[in-house]
Amino acid sequence: MASLIYRQLLANSYTVDLSDEIENIGYAKSKNVTINPGPFAQTGYAPVNWGPGEVNDSTTVEPVLDGPYQPTNFNPPVNYWMLLSPLNAGVVVEGTNSIDRWLATVLVEPNVTTTVRTYTLFGVQEQISVENNSTTKWKFINLIKTTPPGNFTLYSTLLSEPKLHGIMKHGGQLWVYNGETQTLLLQDYVTSNYDSLTMTSFCDFYIIPRNQESTCTEYINNGLPPIQNTRNVVSVSISSRNIIHNRAQVNEDIVISKTSLWKGVQYNRDIINRFRFANAIIKSGGLGYKWSEISFKPANYQYTYTRDGEEITAHTTCSVNGVNDFSFNGGSLPTDFVISRYEVIKENSYVYVDYWDDSQAFRNMVYVRSLAANLNDVLCTGGDYSFALPVGQWPVMTGGAVMLHAAGVTLSTQFTDFVSLNSLRFRFSLSVEEPYFSITRTRVTRLYGLPAVNPNNDRDYYEIAGRFSLISLVPSNDDYQTPIMNSVTVRQDLERQLGELREEFNALSQEIAISQLIDLALLPLDMFSMFSGIQSSIDAAKSMATNVMKKFKKSKLASSVSTLTNSLSDAASSVSRSSSIRSVSSSVSAWTDVSNQFTDISNSVNSISTQTSTISRRLRLKEIATQTEGINFDDISAAVLKTKIDKSTQIAANNIPDVITEASEKFIPNRAYRVISNDNVFEASTDGRFFAYKVGTFEEIPFDVQKLADLVTDSPVISAIIDFKTLKNLNDNYGITREQAFNLLRSDPRVLREFINQDNPIIKNRIEQLILQCRL
């Protein structure tokens, strides 16, 4: 059974103690060593309390709704809507280019018959005939004249219930809204010298960029957001838009805290990240028609660039992870074209670029926190590669492209021929792009991804612009550099890595095939087979197993087993001292630890629910102690864990102890267990639900806590893989025999596989729900 991995970890905890004891003996024998740490020995220990610090961001975010602004005369910017919000009827806005266009808009309230009103427009009183037949909507009337002494004529109108109107300069024309709310149209005025056209607003107004035109239209249709209609919103002068903001420099060092020999420094840097891929193309022996491998290799690249007038020397290392293996076999003859394996990076792959430069930020990168970075995307396209055959036309692998998207940053170390460099590792996720790649003169075509054959497309490098910010704890003495071998990634960055690993792990639940999962759950997984999916794990399997057991020994499951063992020992001695007393407390306390709760058994549902919930939490331990032939929750948990480890692209050997331990505690939190007595079944779940029912008819019977307590002590505990509600649903919809019912109650894997192979939706849905509960 797959749960053998948990049993093995529980049973071998003593090896961890022995390993620790051996290490302690080794330390004791080698402790008498004289070390001369030099004049800066105190800097080996960092202060506990770090300064608060901040991460500056130079990104300018343009608001969608800018305002409100007070009535004024100004030249509105091009490609920006001026959203007018008058409160009363009358003149709303005037505008002129002082050459051949004088424009004005007046507002008329609802229910106005045709009448002549006097308006002061451009300092002159004008008689304008207006009307508004609408009973609910206000009417904006747009007027125009071409000479100062001329008369205003009607150009367009807008009926608006929220009393909002918009004007914009764009494309050599003046644009306004026309028609009626919910069916709005845009109307343009052709005007010369429109850049210098000034507007005089007689009401509050807002400014909205043209790329948010749909939002402006929504406001005119439905009104401003509620927060804009409160008394706390006060209009300001348009001159406030011209305030000069002093922003932090993008390249600077800020001392944010200083204590004794240490200081916290925030480093902000703009960077130019250049990298290139490397590859290996290996031909097979023979007549020259076969290639054995085309693969990606790590590539170092050194370059210089200018940052704020300073020449920067930078070094990058590019590597890939999660490659996809492809092959092409043209036939079995010695002269048939064959590629045994060629690597392609796709959506499931990652590209790592380790970056270092000679600035102060990388000199003392030992204790680091608040690490953040922003980088642009970059498109990587593949080039052509001709496979030189001795005779005949040469096949050519051509095309392929991926887009690199920044997906995170951590600390790393680069190793060159001469030095080791503390660096930043930028991780990029991939998306496939056009064009696809193909091999000419073969049937390989329309495949997507970037093959390893010519990933740089004859470029010297790919380039990404970006910036990063970090806070580093450095010695106050600027002449001292902390040793590189002490480099550590602080907990914040470790938690970010584990968080990303958890997200990927949980997302893999959708990719697990149920039929294969049942088969895997029946295998006797041990530590070595569990780790087989981790690259280079065979070489470090022994040390990894020890690390896993060290971590697992502190888990809740191991602690519960230890507590249970002590409880059983105490219970046995208690029974021997007082064998005449038989109660719920004496028979079940070792397994349930609820003896105090059972002293006064209540008939209320709440009391029974509390008791059964407490019992069910310990039933997992009883099941581990008395293995049955059926499949259990830990088998499914271990099988899902193994599948996700094999599929994961982010998991590494140092993550295994945390993953194994967390999975044992958190996978399938909602479990139900049952015990069978003749034709009666008692079932209790960790969420407090409980059932008692007959096997043949699934008819519910009264639930007896005392009976359950007695049965738990003497009978095997079975995982309710198919719980009572699922069984009843299955029987009601499909009908099952008594034998099938017994097999499902015993979680018989053979019967489960039969139902799954028949695509039974009820059973498949139950197993899928269990898989979805396997989350970190």
From Swiss-Prot:
Q: Region Spike foot: which residues?
A: 510-776
Coiled-coil residues are 484-511
Q: Name one GO biological process term.
A: virion attachment to host cell
Site positions (Cleavage) are 231-232, 241-242, 247-248
Chain segments carrying region Hydrophobic:
389-409
Intervals of motif DGE motif:
308-310
Record's Gene Ontology CC terms?
host cell endoplasmic reticulum-Golgi intermediate compartment; host cell plasma membrane; host cell rough endoplasmic reticulum; host cytoskeleton; membrane; viral outer capsid
Q: Which UniProt keywords apply?
A: Capsid protein, Coiled coil, Disulfide bond, Hemagglutinin, Host cell membrane, Host cytoplasm, Host cytoskeleton, Host endoplasmic reticulum, Host membrane, Host-virus interaction, Membrane, Outer capsid protein, Viral attachment to host cell, Viral penetration into host cytoplasm, Viral penetration via permeabilization of host membrane, Virion, Virus entry into host cell
UniProt motif KID motif: location:
644-646
Q: Where is this region: Spike body and stalk (antigen domain)?
A: 248-479
The record's section on SUPFAM superfamilies has: Concanavalin A-like lectins/glucanases, VP4 membrane interaction domain
> Quick one: where's region Spike head?
65-224
User: What's in the misc comment field?
Assistant: This strain probably does not use sialic acid to attach to the host cell. In group A rotaviruses, VP4 defines the P serotype.
Similarity comment: family membership: Belongs to the rotavirus VP4 family.
Protein name (Swiss-Prot/TrEMBL): Outer capsid protein VP4
